[in-house]
């Protein structure tokens, strides 16, 4: 005879890993080529001067300098640029 009643099953108990998205370097910080500035899904931020965009929309520095965030254009888009220090 069993001394414990059988436990029920559940369909819960799963969760996806966090993707660590977001801004990695902030305005005014010095940066070198290859450093990641923003990890994002889609284009929350657009690439400005001295910034490249990877296939997963990651923004990275192409030149050495200082990061500058700005809002411009008819649609108030947020751009990230690297300006000479």
Swiss-Prot record:
Keyword tRNA-binding: no
GO CC annotation terms, alphabetical: cytosolic large ribosomal subunit
Alphabetical UniProt keywords: Ribonucleoprotein, Ribosomal protein
SUPFAM superfamilies: Ribosomal L27 protein-like
Keyword Ribosomal protein among UniProt keywords: yes
Top-rank lineage group of the source organism: Bacteria
PROSITE patterns reported for this sequence: RIBOSOMAL_L27
GO MF annotation list: structural constituent of ribosome
Entries under Pfam families matching the protein: Ribosomal_L27 (PF01016)
InterPro entries: Ribosomal_bL27 (IPR001684), Ribosomal_bL27_CS (IPR018261)
Family: Belongs to the bacterial ribosomal protein bL27 family.
Matches recorded under PANTHER family: LARGE RIBOSOMAL SUBUNIT PROTEIN BL27M (PTHR15893:SF0), RIBOSOMAL PROTEIN L27 (PTHR15893)
Record-given protein name: Large ribosomal subunit protein bL27
Upper taxonomic lineage: Bacteria, Pseudomonadati, Pseudomonadota, Gammaproteobacteria, Pseudomonadales
Gene: rpmA
């Amino acid at each position: 005879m069993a001394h414990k009643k059988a436990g029920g099953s559940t369909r819960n108990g799963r969760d996806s890993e966090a993707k660590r998205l977001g801004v990695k370097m902030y305005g005014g910080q010095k940066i070198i080529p290859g450093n990641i500035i923003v990890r994002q899904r889609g284009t929350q931020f657009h690439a400005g001067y001295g910034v490249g965009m990877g296939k997963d929309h990651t923004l990275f520095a192409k030149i050495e300098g200082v990061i500058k965030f700005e809002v411009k254009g008819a649609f108030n888009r947020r751009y990230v640029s690297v300006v000479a220090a």
